[in-house]
UniProtKB/Swiss-Prot annotation:
Sequence similarity: Belongs to the DNA mismatch repair MutL/HexB family.
Biological role stated in the UniProt entry: This protein is involved in the repair of mismatches in DNA. It is required for dam-dependent methyl-directed DNA mismatch repair. May act as a 'molecular matchmaker', a protein that promotes the formation of a stable complex between two or more DNA-binding proteins in an ATP-dependent manner without itself being part of a final effector complex.
Source organism, top-level taxon: Bacteria
GO biological process entries: mismatch repair
GO cellular component terms, A-Z: mismatch repair complex
PROSITE patterns linked: DNA_MISMATCH_REPAIR_1 (PS00058)
UniProt keyword annotations, A-Z: DNA damage, DNA repair
NCBIfam families: mutl (TIGR00585), PRK00095.1-3 (NF000950)
Name listed for the protein in its UniProt record: DNA mismatch repair protein MutL
Any GO MF annotation of the entry: ATP hydrolysis activity
Signal peptide: none
Family matches, as InterPro entries: DNA_mismatch_repair_CS (IPR014762), DNA_mismatch_repair_MutL (IPR020667), DNA_mismatch_S5_2-like (IPR013507), HATPase_C_sf (IPR036890), MutL/Mlh/PMS (IPR002099), MutL/Mlh/Pms-like (IPR038973), MutL_C (IPR014790), MutL_C_dimsub (IPR042120)
Length: 645
């Protein structure tokens, strides 16, 4: 007698449930997705014991006929697709016909449903077996209750986490679905307590506020981009609004929440050098494309997808985010009384806005007397005693005298003084225009130069030899001088590292680097990559290398330290990428060459530093993502001194 036999349906469903029903959140996801596919406009989810005891989902969707109710709990029975051609043009959230039978096989299910055109149907199942079937009320929609999850698979129960953890997973699922479908009203309750409520208005900003809070949602800016194959819309948080994990990035593809690491990497690339290490933004992206370009039939849970043109989509997302930040002044403002502001925000009707300080227009797009970034950083890297380029210092007084005359004449006429009412009016301004990223690279560069993102700042002093104090008509600014020159140096060195140059400095005494045998071999395999960054390693014995020259723009006195850092990156990186290697080298050199704390600067040096900073691509954060400038509005300062209440 043969040893191979066919499994009965209940056992097969239990096996399938191992992939589909991982935890209570999986049940919530499948049931709510069914409600959305049924054209529901309102969905209520009720949980007890984080869903382990009870999960109830009520919707006002299409409902089901009696014969469809029975068929819905059969394996691979679905109304979503008809043939194999439909499999490549999936617009619904469900299509496999596995969820309901898998859920029913490991729980007790009660289903009440009706199409609204006649009496409804009630089914009761236990462990996948039909227990009762009867007529029910004719309310249009579906009411399904899943109880005693995993009652017949005790081994699965052992892997469940605490109620708090499981509830967090379930709430996260509902949050993502609410973001993906803002036109559907969602209400999530746990033991009668409302955890989430959305109004189904279709405005995703209201959903963001319901999930992350009103203050966070107000600090998110809209983006929009389109290519031949993709349309991307969404909201991204300002660089100062971050979290400790990537869990706050929500990616929606054709209405389906997905997890995709390459897309998350593309988002992070858009925030390049704007985020501190280990911090991640809050992002909501809704991506629309032809279903042919995405394969959702990768895993039964339908969270993983594959794209046909993934590289093109990644580039579009990165460019869109970068363009959004190029058009904005990203200076964080300090609130005088955060508790009071928060309380007012919760009481008042709110709007979403990011206050943008528009700098005074320059006739030619560039302030008079400002020096070229590369020339300034080049002079700084030559090791002169002055921390700032001499050329910039020479030009600075002309700028400063003219600027100071302008500012103080305005102060005398009362133009500069910000009135509280005007400040409040700016706070209430709504920024509705999304950012589009459809311009070629040179056009984007021209636009960046035309819009002066960092307003002119007029120094008034220095705090502890570390922070520059400056002012303009918008209030007081504190500038971290080390971070500011780090940004200037970083952009200079990044450009130099990408150039092919024969300008090298020969060393009278070669530098020697010795490593263990295993590390020596790994370094030797990457000599070409290091050479493309200006580091030419020459084998010297069985475990050592010599460096006889280096590019002339290497920071003087820091050559060995920088080369060691670059070699260390080669040793620690899983794969050596020339772009990452140059990036790391630029960051290291910019930090080593920057002004340090407790270093007092002359007025002309401060002017030169600020004017050079204004010419950089991203003057708001250092290469490590730390802020360079913090803003105190005149209104907030007046609140500190109780001049306004």
């Amino acid at each position: 007698m043969g040893r191979i036999h066919k499994l009965d349906d209940q056992l097969a469903n239990k096996i399938a449930a191992g992939e589909v029903v991982e935890r209570p959140a999986s049940v919530v996801k499948e049931l709510v997705e069914n409600a959305i596919d049924a054209h529901s406009t309102a969905v209520e989810i009720e949980l007890e014991e984080a869903g382990m005891t009870k999960i109830r989902v009520i919707d006002n969707g299409d409902g089901m006929e009696e014969e469809d109710c029975l068929l819905a709990f059969e394996r691979h029975a679905t109304s979503k697709i008809q043939d194999e051609h439909d499999l490549f043009r999936i617009r619904t959230l469900g299509f496999r016909g596995e969820a309901l039978p898998s859920i029913a096989s490991v729980s007790e299910v009660e289903l009440v449903t009706s199409t609204g055109s006649g009496p409804g149907t009630k089914l009761v199942l236990k462990g996948g077996a039909l227990v009762a079937r009867e007529r029910a009320a004719g309310r249009k929609g579906t009411d399904i209750t899943v109880s005693n999850l995993f009652f017949n698979t005790p081994a699965r129960l052992k892997y469940m986490k605490t109620i708090h953890t499981e509830l967090g997973h379930a709430a996260d699922v509902v949050n993502r679905l609410a973001l993906a479908h803002p036109d559907v009203s969602f209400r999530l309750r746990h033991h009668g307590k409302t955890l989430l409520a959305t109004n189904g208005s279709g405005d995703v900003r209201h959903v963001l506020a319901a999930i992350y809070g009103m203050e966070t949602a107000k600090q998110m800016i809209p983006i929009e981009a389109e290519s031949l194959d993709f349309t991307v819309r969404g909201y991204i948080s300002l660089p100062e609004v971050t979290r400790a994990s990537r869990n706050y990035m929500s990616l929606i593809v054709n209405g389906r929440y997905v997890r995709n690491i390459p897309l998350m990497k593309a988002i992070e690339a858009g925030y390049h050098t704007l985020l501190p290490i280990g911090r991640y933004p809050i992002v909501f992206l809704a991506i629309e494309m032809d279903p042919v370009l995405v394969d959702v039939n990768v895993h039964p849970a339908k969270l993983e997808v594959r794209f046909s043109k993934e590289a093109e989509l990644n580039e579009l997302i990165t460019a869109t985010i970068r363009q959004a930040f190029r058009q904005r002044t990203l200076i964080p403002s300090v609130s005088a009384d955060s508790k009071t502001v928060k309380a007012k925000a919760e009481q008042a009707s709110w709007t979403f806005a990011h206050r943008v300080h528009e700098p005074p227009a320059q006739p030619d797009g560039k302030a008079e007397g400002t020096s070229d970034v590369t020339a300034a950083a080049s002079l700084a890297s030559e090791g002169s005693l002055s921390p700032l380029p001499a050329a910039a210092q020479a030009d600075a007084p002309a700028v400063s005298e003219e600027a100071e005359a302008s500012v103080f004449s305005e102060r005398r006429t009362g133009v500069v003084n910000d009135l509280p009412a005007a400040e409040l009016k700016r706070d209430a301004e709504v920024e509705e225009e999304p950012t589009e990223a459809c311009l070629p690279a040179d056009e984007q560069a021209e636009e960046k130069r035309a819009v002066d993102r960092l307003p002119p700042l007029y120094p008034i002093g220095q705090l502890h030899g570390t922070y520059i104090l400056a002012e303009n008509e918008h209030g007081l600014y504190m500038i971290d001088q080390h971070a500011a020159q780090e940004r200037i140096n970083y952009e200079y060195f990044r450009e130099k590292l990408g150039e092919v140059t024969n300008e090298v400095q020969e060393l009278l005494v070669p530098l020697t680097f010795e490593y263990p045998a295993d590390e020596y071999e790994r370094i030797a395999a990457c000599r070409d990559e290091l050479a493309r960054c200006g580091v030419f390693l020459e084998p010297f014995g069985p475990r050592a290398f010599l460096v006889r020259s280096h590019p002339v723009w290497f920071p003087k006195g820091k050559e060995k330290e920088i080369i060691e850092e670059m070699i260390e990156h080669v040793l620690t990186a899983k794969t050596v990428d020339i772009k990452q290697l140059r990036e790391q080298a630029a960051i290291v050199m910019s930090c080593k060459r920057a002004i340090k704390a407790n270093q007092h600067l002359r007025t002309d040096e401060i002017f030169a530093l600020l004017e050079t900073l204004r010419q950089t691509t991203d003057p708001f954060t250092c290469p490590h993502g730390r802020p360079i400038i913090v803003h105190f509005s005149t209104y907030e300062i007046e609140k500190l001194f109780k001049r306004v209440m």
